[in-house]
Amino acid sequence: ELVHSFKLVKDQYSLLAPFYNRLTKLVFGDQLKWSKTCFAENLSGKKVLIIGGGDGLDYQIFQDDLEGEYWEISRSMLLKSKINLEGSDLSFHLGFFQAEKENVFDEVWLHFVLDTMRDEEIESLLIEVRKSLKPKGKVYLADFFVPQNLYQRFKQSIMIHFFRMVANHKRKNLPDYEEILKRQNWLKNAERDILKGWVKAQVWSLSTSI
């Protein structure tokens, strides 16, 4: 059953959803999938919060161990994820994630979602994530960072223009994720570079210092 939040937006991914995964694989192969799954381990018994997970196909291989919540603002993507992850123990939610008291998670996955948001939206989301994370919980970030060569800069420019046109993305550039996270007292615990560092997979936790 899908759970609806009170704050919904027009589904900007309705045109992309049917072929989004195939398009991603055509352009990047399995590199983006690997960035989302390279830190996924010992999931059994953990409660996971997935925000902006798309069609969920990249998580299918370990869906039997997934328990928690799956949030999407695209109804078409969420419907596909519910089918692709029908073997999981996730509940599926349509709308913008908002923390609920005493509903906390071991892990929060932010995979290729922050690059679609304005800085102030990222900051607001991270506040909600902070409320929803257990004291020793981790945030798993995977996203595009600074392009490492001319070809990557060209490809990124094409991608940004494409998603601004087709999916109404707001940004004309990439956020400085690390600056925003550090400003909110998050610590980077681990990092893996993909595509020479254009894509990074990172693990973050809350600093215990003030």
Model-derived segments and their meaning:
Residues A142-Q184, K188-I194, W198:
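C-terminal alpha-helical "lid/dimerization" subdomain adjacent to the S-adenosyl-L-methionine
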Residues F28-K46, L57:
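Conserved alpha-helix/loop element of class I SAM-dependent methyltransferases that forms part
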Residues A201-I210:
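C-terminal lobe and adjacent flexible extensions of AdoMet/dcAdoMet transferase-like proteins
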Residues E1-F19:
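N-terminal, positively charged/glycine-rich alpha-helical extensions of SAM-dependent methyltransferases
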Residues W109:
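A conserved beta-strand element that flanks and buttresses the S-adenosyl-L-methionine
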Residues L49-A99:
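Class I SAM-dependent methyltransferase SAM/SAH-binding core
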Residues E123-P135:
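A short glycine-rich, Lys/Arg-flanked "PGG" loop and its adjoining helix->strand segment in the class I
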Residues F112-D115:
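Short catalytic micro-motifs in class I SAM-dependent methyltransferases
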